[in-house]
Amino acid sequence: MGLEVAADSVGSALAAQDGGAIRVELCGGLDGGGLTPSFGTLAVVRERLQIPLYVLIRPRVGDFVFDAAEVEVMRRDVEQCVRLGCDGVVLGALDLQGQVDLPAMRALIEAAGTLGVTFHRAIDVSADPARVLEDAIALGCERVLTSGARASALEGVETIAALVRQAGERISIMPGAGVSAANVQALRAGTGAREFHASARGPVAAQVHAPHPYITDLGGDYQRTDVARVRSIVQLLQTA
């Protein structure tokens, strides 16, 4: 039983570790759903993190239908993760019919070599989550991150539970989206899942001394993973 934390900065990754997370999913642009992190962020986090590090590979916002150039970008990002000694990558690609883009996924998984692979929330916008789960298993993925095809994992609890039953011992189903200390016990009881995914973020006040009177989207407050929030979720998961 454990918590994976989605972190989009060095500070968030280290806070996740300090709070007792079992793993970090490193990304960039978490407010937009998450993108591939910068090379610098990845390198520094890899140097400083002691717990397993998985890296989101997503070249842009929007859907998960990627053209050949985008798949090549993703493949090269995966290769960087291999070179830096990351523990795994987080992937997902769909075709125009909303099914798993098997050629793209196979190319990316081949590039990952011995790294672990999580299939991400592309399953939640797919045409058939149950079929996507079977494809993820066949591809050799370790786990699937899902909200149960709903805006939050709590709303998708019934679908997540069905995926957990379908998966059996073949693959881990990891609920994510809106997971917090307020609902993780209900999610645990309602789904039977054994690992969960959250950002556990809280607000950080801007350090600027004199906010600009006309610009509100630059230099303001931001969100960062909070050690106490991580610890609260972890402690609840450790409660029998």
Curated annotation (Swiss-Prot):
Compartment(s) where it occurs, according to its Swiss-Prot or TrEMBL record: Cytoplasm
Entries under SUPFAM superfamilies matching the protein: CutC-like
This protein's record includes keyword Nucleotide-binding: no
Pfam families reported in the protein's UniProt record: CutC (PF03932)
GO CC list: cytoplasm
GO molecular function, one term: copper ion binding
Signal peptide: none
Main location as per UniProt: cytoplasm
Keyword Chaperone: no
InterPro entries from the UniProt entry: CutC-like, CutC-like_dom_sf
Domain of life: Bacteria
UniProt keyword list: Cytoplasm
Protein family per UniProt: Belongs to the CutC family.
Official protein name in the record: PF03932 family protein CutC
Organism: Xanthomonas campestris pv. campestris (strain B100)
